[in-house]
Structure formats: C-alpha cells, structure tokens
Amino acid sequence: MIDKLMSRRRLFEAAAGALLLSGCSSQDESSTKKVKKQGKIKKAESSDGDKHLRDKDELYEVYDDSGIVTMYLTVSRGNSSENTDHSWAEINAYSVYDYADMGVTRYQVMGLLQPGDVDGPVAGEVGYGEEAPNATVQVRGQTSSMNSQKNYKVELKKGKGTWRQQRAIALNKHMGEGMRFRNKMAYDLIRGIPQMMGLRTQFVHLWVCDQTEKSNDTFEDYGLFTQVEQLNKTALKAHGLDKNGHLYKVNSFDFHRYEDTIKLADDPDYNQTNFEGMLEIKGDSDHTKLIEMLDALNDESQKIDDVLDTYFDTENLVYWMAFQILTGNCDTQNRNCYLYSPLNSKTWYILDWDNDGMLRKLELSLKGFSDYASWERGVSNYWGNVLFNRALRSKAFRSELDRAVKDLRSYLTEARLSKMIKHYREVTESLVFAAPDIDNLPVTKDQYEQIAAAIPSEIEENYKSYCESFKKPMPFFIGVPQIDNGKLRINWDASYDFEARDIRYTVELARDYAIKDVLFKAEDVLLPEVTCDAPDAGQYFVRVRATNSDGYTQDAFDYYVTDDGKHYGMKCFYVQDGGKVVEDTYEEG
C-alpha cells in the first residue's frame, strides 16, 4: 500500500515538474522575442510660472447670441422678510441715491421669468408652464438708476432653475447711449482677443406684466435691453477661473493705500460700507492679500517692474488698457472694471466691465457736450491711478503697452467694425426706433446714421491720441488756493514728461470759466507756485497748463462742470468775507 502511495506521489511530482519545465520553456521563448522600444513619455511643462488668463472659447458656442431673445416677466408683491412687498411703480420710482437718503435697501418685487419668442414662453425654458414666481426683481446700476428707463436685475431663486446656467440676469437699457449696442459690441470684440477675459451677452426684448397693484394678464412692451453675464462666482467657474478667489467690483478706487478704509474685516475700525464704496466685495472677504499688494505698490522704494512681476500679469494690464484707449472707453480711470485674484495666487488681474461709453466721440459732439477730451484721451487718462502712474514710468511696461496697442489696432479694423455695426442695426433697429425706446433715444434718426457711419474710424483717431499723449507732459492736480497777508497763493503738483523735457507753466486767475475776465496771468513759470494780490469776495477760477520744450501742452486734472460738460484744466473756488477760501467740488455721477 505504501509502495502504491509512493508510486502515485512520484507520478504527481513528475507531472508537476513537467508542467513547471514547460512553463519555464514558454517564458524563455517569449522573453527572447523582440519588443519594440517605447518612446519617452512627453509631459507638459509645469504651468506654475504661466500667469496669463485665457477664456473658454467653447462657452460662447453653446447658444446663438447673435439675435434677440424675448423674455416675459410677471411681477407681483411678495413679503416683507425678502423686501419684496412693494409695487412695480415703487421699484421704478427710486434711484440708488433715493434709497441712500431713505436709509433702506433697494426695494424688490417677486417675478416669474419666462424666456420665449414673439408668440410667448417656450417649452424647455426656465419658468415654462409655471404660475408661481421663480425670481426677485430690482433696479440695478448706480447713475443709471436715475434714468426714466431702468436697468433690472432678475435673480432666479435657488431650486427654480437657471437661464443659460445663470441665475442672476442683468438687463441693461443703456438709455444714455444712442446706438444701444455698444456694450454687446465690446464683448463680441473681446471674444476675438485671447489676452482678455469676456462675458456672455444677449440682446433681449422684455415684456412685463404688472400684478403688484391689481389682477392683470397683459404684458407691456419694455423695449430693447442688453443682457450681460454677471461677474460673480458662477461666472468665474464658467470661464475657467477660481470661483473661490478674490473678486472686487471697482466702484471708485485709484490704488492708493487708503489705510483708513482698506482694512481687514476683523479690524475694530473696519467699515464695510466705506470699503465697498471703493471696492465692492464679490468674492473672498479676506483682504490680507489686497493690502499686501497695495503696500508694495505704494512703496516708492520698491522698483515698479519688480512689483508688477510679483503682483500682476503685465499682459493682462496692457491689453485691458490698450482696449480701453483704442475704443475711447475713458470712464475707466478708477471704476467700471473688476479686480480678480485666484485664492492661492499673489497675482491680480483687471477684468473688463461696462463698455457703453466707448466709441462716442461724434455722438458727444453732436449733443454739444464736452466730455472725454483733453487729458482723458491716451495714457494720460490713467495718470491719476497709482498702478498705471507707476507702471507707465517703466520703459519695459510702455514697450509692452505699445505692442498691445498695435496688435489691437490691427484687429479693430474699420472693415470688422463696419460689418458688426451692420449686423447690430439689422437686429435692433426695429426696437430702437419704436416705442418705448424711441421716446427716450438721445439722438435723432439722422444723427444715428452719422454716428453709425463714424464709429469705425474712431479707433484710428484714438490711436493718434494715444501716440500724441506720450509727447505731452502728464496732467497734475491744482491745490486749493490760500490767502495770507493779502496775497493769494496758488500751487499745484509738478507735471511729468516721459522724455524729461523741460516744463513751464501758464497760470491764469479769472472771474469766469471761459477765462475771459482775467485778473492775473503768469507765463513761463518754472516752479509749481505763484502768488498774486488776493481778490475780493466772490467766485473765481484758476487755470494751470503745462508746456514742454517741444511745445506740447497739457491741462491740469481739475475741471469745472456745467450743463455743457467739462471745462478742463481749472479749479473753481470761492473767497468768502473774511478771506476764507472754499473749494468747489464735484461728484462724478
């Protein structure tokens, strides 16, 4: 029995050995076959040093934004907790300044938003088939809130759906702009500029049914609006940016340190209202990084090129600036843009916002209104901003700016702009020249035709202004005159010349802003101060101009405002009984 077991064991071992040898033989044979050598894996280089922002082109291809979308908005009263227990008449009656005077937040109403076509709401769109409100509605904007035709913000409530992945729907009337298509035109142009970040836009025909006062099922025509994507966390994410980053809407900020206002949120003296008067918080509320950047920027001992390398992307700055200069969008010295920085980055970027003031040179001229002239053309427009004042003193920055300006000049051709204007007119004119918009249009039909024909050539005019601005001295501020021992002392900041040319000043004191009734005049003044006999009590104007050795003249930053616009280069002041001098001030609207 033992012999049989041993015999079976030997047989099993022999079989196992044979299988093992067979396996080894097979492995040896396969290992001798030639295997094609694989090439080295190609890996992308680290992007840590690449600070440039790039928009998502495919984002603009999802929807056709070339025509007009019809929107139906039914407004109704809500509740006091949400501040929606108001009438539609109240919503349209008050401006942001009225709310400030009343000490209350902007009134809202409930709304049912239903996008559709000329026949009504369309299936598949937000709000279709619904009867209960899905949104809140309020007037938006600052100075525009004083207009008879308002801009609206329609905020879709959470869980009520979105329109094109957006909950905040901003509808802009652009009442003061005669063409009514400039803002969309700007963003359509930005789509073709890789170095700039844009936003999605759409022409909208709005109809409103007011149910806040009584039962009603009739929609009233509110005319043409331009919907512009709201720059918020949702938009940051959609455009491939950091939704957790820092985002500020620049309301009135020229990059001075402003230590009394720009503080950390946990500072005992922090006042958010004052802070947001300068920079409206739209993202992360930790201002540490902002303050670090401002400290460095306002530290004259730090080289500006080093500051720019550390805290900014020069490409972003020069292309944003070049676009504003060439399009003549002058009201961007210290507002009408956003400041953005990814959460874990030191780099800050300027993002474009509000372009309805662009390409308006002829339109303003036809209205007989003086604005966006003198130093507001070319690089001098940004000289009062600490960031650009310091940056423009750098030859390297000026060289990059010049390359960007020339690049965009070759893109913003008359042919391109003419083609775009032709399309916008075909899409919008039927609404622009019909009620209710025709009743508030600031230009006549003939003027509209003149402006449309002239817009494409304004790019070249603005380019010439840009080139000439480097030849002139830079603008400067006039101080408040002082009276001492019967003498009036007038001083001002020194002007600056990019080529260090000799600068002399002309000073005039007059009783009128036309500077015809002149009391005192000094020419070829070398130092930024003069004295003259103190005038009697009354209103006076002092005008100071700087002229360099090449004969180019620049006005002071100061200006006097009348119904006809700005009168550049002068400061208005009053001498009261007893010799006290009171400065005339003007708040930008």
Give names to the regions the model predicted.
Residues 550-582:
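Extracellular fibronectin type III
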Residues 1-6, 14-21, 31-33:
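N-terminal secretory signal peptides
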Residues 520-526:
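Short beta-strand segments within Ig-like beta-sandwich modules, predominantly Fibronectin type-III
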Residues 174, 196-199, 215-322, 328:
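Internal "kinase-insert"/substrate-recognition segments embedded within catalytic cores
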Residues 79-81, 147, 283-291, 295-333, ...:
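Middle-to-C-terminal accessory/interaction subdomains
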Residues 34-185:
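Conserved NTP-binding catalytic cores of kinases and kinase-like/nucleotidyltransferase enzymes
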Residues 535-553:
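Beta-strand-rich modules
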